[in-house]
Amino acid sequence: MLDVASLEKFDFLNNFVLAAGHNGLSRTISNVVILDHEGIDGDFSDFHEGDFVITNLLFAKNSPQKIYFSFEALISIGVSAFAVKTVFFKELPSEVIELADKKEVPVFLFNDIYIEDVILGITDHLRSSSNYNYYETLLDSFLA
C-alpha cells in the first residue's frame, strides 16, 4: 500500500507544494486518475475511493466555481489527494483550500514537471507493490 506521505520517496515530490489537507497525508492511494472533462459535465462516476487525482483545471478556466463543485464531489467519493498543475490557476480559491483542510484531503500544487511523469511514477510503484503482495501471498501458501 502507498499512502500520500510515502510520495516523499519520489523525485517529483520536490516540485510539489502542499497547499491544503496537511492532516490527510495518511490517506491510501489505490490508483492515479486525471480530472478533465468530468469537471465540465459533473459526471464523476469513473472516480473511486483512494484515487490520486491529477488535473490542470482546464475545465474551470472560464468558470472557477467549477473547482469547488468538482473537489467537493470527489472528496465525497473518498479520493486520496489532488495534484494540480498550475497552468491555468496559480493558486486555488480559498473555499477550496478550506474544504480540503476541513475534510483532511491533501492538495498539492506543481508546475515544472509533466503530469505523465507523476502518473507513471505512482502507477509503477502501485503495480510493483501489487506484484510483491501477490508473490508474498503465493509463497505463504506454499509454506503453510
Language model feature labels by segment:
Residues 1-144:
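Alpha-helical/coil-rich non-catalytic "connector" segments in signaling and regulatory proteins
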